[in-house]
């Protein structure tokens, strides 16, 4: 079963992504912040991570850096607010596979995540 870790401090986005990917047959883990995300990965390595960049506490870029040090094989797709170009560039240089700007097209995100499992 394909597994996905969804990390976003906005509950509505977590629930939307959860619903879409459960329908696709994914095993979903949800995290509301960076620390929860890292703890979830330590418990069970996901097949892919959808990671918000702007979160209180441990932000997405720091989570991405830690993921790439500890689990470089996990593909990470980032989600960022419009206008955060520098942060997006930093994330791609750090190892993110792809990015989406909020508000994003849910079907494009779905297709990108599915593509991570085909490669």
Map each language-model feature to its residues:
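Receiver (REC) domain active-site loop signature in two-component systems and cognate sites
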Residues: 55
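Active-site beta3 strand of CheY-like receiver
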Residues: 44-50
């Amino acid at each position: 079963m394909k597994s996905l870790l969804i990390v976003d401090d906005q509950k509505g986005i977590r629930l939307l992504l959860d619903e879409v990917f459960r329908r696709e047959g994914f095993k979903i883990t949800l995290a509301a912040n960076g620390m929860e995300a890292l703890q979830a990965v330590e418990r069970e390595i996901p097949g892919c991570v959808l990671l918000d960049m702007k979160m209180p506490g441990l932000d997405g870029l720091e989570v991405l850096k830690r993921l790439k040090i500890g689990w470089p094989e996990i593909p990470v797709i980032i989600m960022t607010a419009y206008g955060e170009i520098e942060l997006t560039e930093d994330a791609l240089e750090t190892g993110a596979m792809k990015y989406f700007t909020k508000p994003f097209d849910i079907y494009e995100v779905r297709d990108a995540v599915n593509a991570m499992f085909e490669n």
